[in-house]
């Protein structure tokens, strides 16, 4: 199972229409930001530079981007993940693993040697680039600022770059390494769709030293995002009250999910407030039994005792999961 959030495989194997499924396979807020009413011209005209500037201004405030650090928008962080290896000077990359697989895949596709390392490992000699997902997906591991600074200083001596994927950092802004970009060779990727529950909008950001952000902006071109994405993103990122309330709501929902999973015999192995990673010696059988009841969670080809569950959207969905688990 390569990624969560796509019911195509589930329906092909187990049938059922999309509405019949409870999709818990992705770490995306199931209660999204309420879409604002958009004027018709947002859909009809090309996005203006003023529209883009307004979005980036909102993002700078939301992500606490300091002066002297730049920011660029793109159609989701996946676009940025694909571009970074092509914009980087020659050199090999270390990926703190296991983690989101598209980072290593993008660098390998660009012809780079990719080395998987553990969070506790020293960076190998000969490495010019390091990729860290923080908080990590799927285990939620957090690397503190001291560790990130140590790695970035090591890489600075090699004229390289540390790329920090903060797709889940909205859950706790104190985790973010954005402030470190002012003095260290770091590019931070921020995902809009996960925390705001609007993954289909395709919006993400790169934050870092001006030289790198200019390189990214030039590669992406003059219209990096659609007009609707600019408008919705600006509204959501400016809504600080919604973000604060959502953090509290997600924490409460995650604890409720913990209770259900623990009662079914799963041991927590990690996660964030948007997903839980759990361990069970019969995890693959559990995955199959749930799928037969049209409940889809995330399994992993590299670990047959792990499953990841996203948050159920409401009490009825949580109860549905609890009933299905109790029958196993």
Describe each PLM feature range.
Residues 1-51, 58:
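N-terminal "arm"/small-domain region of PLP-dependent enzymes with the aminotransferase-like
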Residues 35, 122, 282-289, 316-320:
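Short, conserved charged micro-motifs
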Residues 53, 68-93:
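Conserved beta-loop-alpha segment that forms the PLP phosphate-binding cup at the N-terminus of a helix
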Residues 85-108, 113-116, 120:
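Conserved PLP-anchoring active-site segment centered on the Schiff-base-forming lysine
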Residues 115-172:
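Active-site phosphate-binding strand-loop segment of PLP-dependent enzymes
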Residues 146, 302-328:
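PLP-dependent enzyme catalytic core of the Aspartate aminotransferase-like
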Residues 185-269:
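PLP-dependent aminotransferase class I/II
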Residues 251, 261-293, 311:
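Conserved PLP-binding catalytic core of the aspartate aminotransferase-like
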């Amino acid at each position: 199972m390569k990624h969560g959030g796509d019911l195509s495989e589930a329906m092909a194997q187990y049938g059922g229409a999309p509405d019949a499924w409870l999709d818990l396979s992705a770490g995306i807020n199931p209660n999204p930001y309420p879409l604002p009413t958009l004027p018709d011209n947002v859909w009809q005209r090309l996005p203006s530079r003023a529209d883009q500037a307004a979005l980036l201004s909102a993002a700078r405030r939301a992500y606490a981007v300091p002066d002297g650090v730049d920011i660029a928008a793109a159609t989701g962080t996946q676009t940025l993940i694909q571009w970074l290896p092509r914009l980087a000077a020659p050199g090999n990359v270390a990926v703190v693993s296991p983690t989101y697989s598209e980072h290593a895949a993008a660098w390998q596709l660009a012809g780079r040697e990719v080395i998987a390392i553990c969070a506790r490992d020293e960076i190998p000699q000969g490495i010019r680039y390091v990729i860290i997902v923080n908080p990590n997906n799927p285990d939620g591991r957090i690397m503190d600022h001291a560790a990130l600074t140590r790695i970035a200083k090591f890489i600075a001596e090699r004229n390289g770059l540390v790329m920090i994927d903060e797709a889940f950092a909205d859950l706790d802004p104190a985790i973010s390494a954005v402030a470190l970009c002012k003095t260290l060779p770091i590019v931070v990727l921020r995902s809009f769709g996960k925390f705001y529950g609007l993954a289909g909008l395709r919006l993400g950001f790169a934050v870092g030293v001006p030289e790198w952000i200019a390189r990214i902006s030039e590669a992406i071109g003059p219209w990096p995002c659609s007009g609707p994405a600019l408008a919705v993103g600006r509204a959501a990122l400016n809504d600080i009250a919604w973000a604060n309330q959502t953090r509290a709501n997600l924490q409460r929902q995650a604890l409720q999910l913990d209770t259900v999973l623990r009662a079914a015999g799963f041991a927590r192995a990690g996660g964030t407030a948007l997903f839980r990673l759990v361990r069970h010696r019969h995890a693959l059988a559990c995955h199959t039994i749930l799928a037969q009841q049209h409940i889809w969670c995330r399994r992993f080809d590299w670990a047959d005792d792990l499953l990841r569950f996203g948050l159920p959207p409401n009490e009825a969905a949580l109860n549905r999961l609890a009933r299905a688990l109790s029958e196993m």
